[in-house]
């Protein structure tokens, strides 16, 4: 009882204590909560960061406000907030300045792949159940702010100062998810032999990776236990054991505690048991190997343990048999690369002020003191650069550079003429289109303020300093052609006048005629002929009386004697009316006697006007004559005055009695413009050099008096008034001094030394920018200077100087004994040596100097071996046996075993220890064979004239003709080893002559002479032509468009003066009465006259062919006439019609009159004495206007093919009826005359493509081997103009390089994993390297050669050695990579969604023991992009049903069976099952899971959708009995139709039990039919209402619907 009560008390106390503890805990928790709430009531709050202040760059600072506030929103003292969590008030920043915009920029990457939008909190989005085509995605890109110079990333705030940050993400669409697709499993592996538990496995590989959120790949491996394992018999071990070695430890030096390890034991910590391995050790004696100071030898160890085939550890003794594996070895202690301190920063590269505020660059460097050894840290960057800004207010502005040009050189017409005709040669002055060139160079641009103060011209610099395209160095130009004046015809000879009417002297005068300039001369050689001619004459008179006669007025009565009134006016030599006081005294009488015939008198007409003079001048043989005549109008009656004789009816007088020899002034060409000191002193223009260079000068010429047909005569024979000027002012051409640029800077000499023992020269040049002209200072002779570089020493060369190798260093004896238990100093060790850098004079140098000049550094450490007692020993190798001259011979060397090795069996294994070595003998027989294709035909290079600006001229590189083509030769020895072509006595090429056909242009004849004008009066056409001589071929210039006769024509308008040929008429013959028997002989008759066509230019007035005169204006040769009888009234001839107004107003009248000469005897009234008629246009009234032709084509001078020409148009006077008339008609009416009858024009020059010369051949594209090419290029200087030869497409030429052998280091394959005594575990793989010779591509045909031919070894230890592992039995290991799958595109509806496809490969793991499967690695899937992929689709395939079961699998469109890829929702059923079971006769379970009927039966379904029974189709050949018989006749049913309608004819439900759509359709259609029938019945049965209202007037029926159904 006591015990029980005691326990109860104890229990009560403990419960009370627990309750008390719980209450205290709650109190403390509440207090802490309240305190925490108190602390959390005050929080820190910060404002935005202010502007960055300070210097530009990273040295700025910015601040912000920080305060404490209560959670309710009011500000609190700072002490209420926790000071430890107070945010900082200041921070450093990068102050952005304006010039930083050139330093920093946003760098935007390409958009990444479109990825699915992640779900909330970064979780993967749940896969959509239905995805039709695409799903929403998101794609990102990287946006960062970069410093342009070194491409380093800086804060985004810097770039945001200049431009907003580009977006980093955007929405996109991606295809529906695609699951991982894998292949089918491989067959199960065979079970391993032996007893015990064994596993077998099977694997599959990845075909396509998961994309766009698809499912990951399933397991690629499966394992299972072998069936019926064989139990191990008694006495046999169930497990196998393997010695496993671990990785080597890091290299270290021995510690002091490892000095003496004698007698200690080493625990085998790798074993699961507590087995100890006891090893005895000798005492450690310290000794040191001599090592170079840079290399320290340490040691490294590894663990060794025994593992069982099930993966468990076992006793080490179960694995160690003959020899224990190596667990300790010497190694090189790691040593990092050692560099010097940074050098001081170099000066800022920008030492001037530019407008762009772009920064400069400064750098600093450091040198390598010692390279990394033993796997130490490699050397860091040795050069560092950063941007800098040169500060200072007095910085000079940065130089700017721009393209400059010289003046254009003289226009060279010959360049184009040679293109037209290669055989052209200069025979005289040439003109027309040409090409001119100029020099283009780059020079420093001087500011305007500096350029105005300095006299120095620009200095050429490197062309690379100028930005932008260079100006053109050539252009088309024109040398103006000279053309003489075009003058009018001569005027008529004027009267005989004094030479100077203002001061008449002497008794001799001159008769003169003039002509005027129609078109001025052009060009420097254009001349005008003389414009005035004179002939001397007697009795000159400057003023003459000109009298006009009135009609005859009878003095008494109406007939008999009378008088005429004479009206005289005084005219000067120009025909102008002047005062009568100037004419000679006395003036002509005012009255002149005349006679009026009486009634019976003979009546004669008035005198006609004097005819034109028969000759323009008189000579000894003939004189000029003029005639006038009158005719008998009426015969005399009885007692009347008789008619005059025929001689009295005509009068003659002399005219143009001056000589036919004319006098005129002839002038020489104007001389050059020369200075006139009086004039130029007043017209001074000061040039930049302070000398008078321009002004006004004078030109002079000589004047000669020429007598036609004689030559020069005395000047006094010619009238002084027409003497041309001999002096005229002119603009004195400016003197142009030669201007050259300043010399360029000397090309730099190498600093501070020159490589090689050659003479280095530096040069400079200058360019002529203006040639001297007009007596200016000539150009200097020296434009290029060269000199040797002075005080330049040879660059020192450096080389490595290795010391002797040290003795072989082994692991210290104490450590070797403690790890291996042996004291013999043998085995593998290391040798070291020191390597120093020395110059040519054996002086020590920095290691950096050798590293710059040499490729790598000689090795500092090498492996060595100290033979042990049990090792095999040999004699040294003998020398190789001599070689014979046979190329197939070999040479041999031998060695022998020595000592005890001769008795050891392992030493006699020739595969391990060969005693004989053989190698082929060198062969001196070489063969050559061609390689590659022939090069293009290469023409020999010509010399280029520097003065031609790089254009084609005679003697330049040819474009066609004979050339050479090349083919490379490969040289090899008899074994196929490539050697240098010189061994085959060859230059490396086969050369073959070739020909490039020369292009021939279309050749036309010269222009024929111009034909005569097609019109003899007015405007016509002149034609000239060319005809084809040679057709073009081989790319020559094409021909212009030719006519059917292979001719090309050119037509220009022409004008012939209408008075050039005129009709001359003689007087009418007397009127011949028709009836001669009549007396007196009067009445009607005919009269005739003689007409002839004469040339107005012919002095003699001789007749010409009548066809030259205008036939429309030919005068009548016969006309009707009348001879009035004595008793008849006689009237005078009709006067001329009065002039109509110029407007030809039809209301205006034209009038003519005549007067009575003799009244009739019987007082009959005479005829009318006046007539009027209206002014009708184009009948008796004409209007006149100037007619202009169109501008002609551009006319060039003779023998000129292009350039400046003249377009002309012709002016004629045209009557309103379209007839061309003399220009006098338009001139007399003062019509406005067009000003310009010619304008300059330009005929585009046909220019062949102008090319530069070929550049020098480039270096070979390969330093050795086959397939190397060298090339040269040329450039288009001036493209083709017009129909010139096109530029060749081949602007680059290539030819093969000589085939020289290539020597390369080749790495061998990795060796098997060497474990050095272990069975599995961690080991090392090595591979060797060798020097091979090849022809440019390393293949299996590469031949190993001497290593010296390949130079320094470029491989480091990491390339020649790598760690590896060998799995132990029982370990889980990974398989090799599978083959890459086919390239597959992502496609939607059979169309590619992306341009690149994907390939996949995988590797999985193999389980050897289920106990170790947790330690297996993960399976790996690797994907890479690919091109040339295809679109594949995946479909479900199924086998035939077998007992309502079948196999279903997914197959790719190329026939590959896969897992994945097909839609799981569309997977067909693999098991067929109907519920309820199909027990009706002739029924079976269909694929859809519902009961159907066999062939020949149709389904009768219940309303519930289940099968009621199977009904036999009538006419079916199936003889099975029906369940129910149908009444009626059995009609034959087409079985095919039955098959078509079988699936839906009587089945209202689909296989899923849902109502089919046709049921709804039939129901809806039936309902509509019923409504239609009811509505129709209603209309048929409805009674029509009688119409009781009175009919209204019918309105016309319209087509508008008014709502009445009856309509």
Swiss-Prot record:
<feature type="disulfide bond">
    <location>
        <begin position="789"/>
        <end position="795"/>
    </location>
</feature>
<feature type="glycosylation site" description="N-linked (GlcNAc...) asparagine">
    <location>
        <position position="1335"/>
    </location>
</feature>
<dbReference type="InterPro" id="IPR056991">
    <property type="entry name" value="TSP1_TSH7A-B_C"/>
</dbReference>
<dbReference type="InterPro" id="IPR044004">
    <property type="entry name" value="TSP1_spondin_dom"/>
</dbReference>
<feature type="domain" description="TSP type-1 15">
    <location>
        <begin position="1183"/>
        <end position="1246"/>
    </location>
</feature>
<feature type="glycosylation site" description="N-linked (GlcNAc...) asparagine">
    <location>
        <position position="1457"/>
    </location>
</feature>
<feature type="domain" description="TSP type-1 9">
    <location>
        <begin position="737"/>
        <end position="796"/>
    </location>
</feature>
<feature type="domain" description="TSP type-1 3">
    <location>
        <begin position="179"/>
        <end position="233"/>
    </location>
</feature>
<feature type="disulfide bond">
    <location>
        <begin position="1383"/>
        <end position="1387"/>
    </location>
</feature>
<dbReference type="Pfam" id="PF00090">
    <property type="entry name" value="TSP_1"/>
</dbReference>
<feature type="disulfide bond">
    <location>
        <begin position="431"/>
        <end position="481"/>
    </location>
</feature>
<feature type="domain" description="TSP type-1 14">
    <location>
        <begin position="1128"/>
        <end position="1182"/>
    </location>
</feature>
<feature type="signal peptide">
    <location>
        <begin position="1"/>
        <end position="31"/>
    </location>
</feature>
<feature type="disulfide bond">
    <location>
        <begin position="1372"/>
        <end position="1416"/>
    </location>
</feature>
<dbReference type="InterPro" id="IPR000884">
    <property type="entry name" value="TSP1_rpt"/>
</dbReference>
<feature type="glycosylation site" description="N-linked (GlcNAc...) asparagine">
    <location>
        <position position="1187"/>
    </location>
</feature>
<feature type="topological domain" description="Extracellular">
    <location>
        <begin position="32"/>
        <end position="1556"/>
    </location>
</feature>
<keyword id="KW-0325">Glycoprotein</keyword>
<feature type="disulfide bond">
    <location>
        <begin position="411"/>
        <end position="477"/>
    </location>
</feature>
<feature type="domain" description="TSP type-1 8">
    <location>
        <begin position="662"/>
        <end position="735"/>
    </location>
</feature>
<feature type="disulfide bond">
    <location>
        <begin position="1121"/>
        <end position="1125"/>
    </location>
</feature>
<feature type="domain" description="TSP type-1 17">
    <location>
        <begin position="1304"/>
        <end position="1369"/>
    </location>
</feature>
<feature type="disulfide bond">
    <location>
        <begin position="971"/>
        <end position="984"/>
    </location>
</feature>
<dbReference type="Pfam" id="PF19030">
    <property type="entry name" value="TSP1_ADAMTS"/>
</dbReference>
<feature type="glycosylation site" description="N-linked (GlcNAc...) asparagine">
    <location>
        <position position="1105"/>
    </location>
</feature>
<feature type="glycosylation site" description="N-linked (GlcNAc...) asparagine">
    <location>
        <position position="219"/>
    </location>
</feature>
<feature type="glycosylation site" description="N-linked (GlcNAc...) asparagine">
    <location>
        <position position="683"/>
    </location>
</feature>
<feature type="domain" description="TSP type-1 6">
    <location>
        <begin position="484"/>
        <end position="543"/>
    </location>
</feature>
<feature type="disulfide bond">
    <location>
        <begin position="1297"/>
        <end position="1302"/>
    </location>
</feature>
<keyword id="KW-1133">Transmembrane helix</keyword>
<keyword id="KW-0472">Membrane</keyword>
<feature type="domain" description="TSP type-1 1">
    <location>
        <begin position="40"/>
        <end position="98"/>
    </location>
</feature>
<feature type="disulfide bond">
    <location>
        <begin position="960"/>
        <end position="998"/>
    </location>
</feature>
<keyword id="KW-0732">Signal</keyword>
<feature type="disulfide bond">
    <location>
        <begin position="1260"/>
        <end position="1264"/>
    </location>
</feature>
<feature type="glycosylation site" description="N-linked (GlcNAc...) asparagine">
    <location>
        <position position="985"/>
    </location>
</feature>
<feature type="disulfide bond">
    <location>
        <begin position="738"/>
        <end position="779"/>
    </location>
</feature>
<keyword id="KW-0812">Transmembrane</keyword>
<dbReference type="GO" id="GO:0016020">
    <property type="term" value="C:membrane"/>
</dbReference>
<feature type="domain" description="TSP type-1 4">
    <location>
        <begin position="336"/>
        <end position="392"/>
    </location>
</feature>
<feature type="domain" description="TSP type-1 5">
    <location>
        <begin position="399"/>
        <end position="482"/>
    </location>
</feature>
<feature type="disulfide bond">
    <location>
        <begin position="655"/>
        <end position="660"/>
    </location>
</feature>
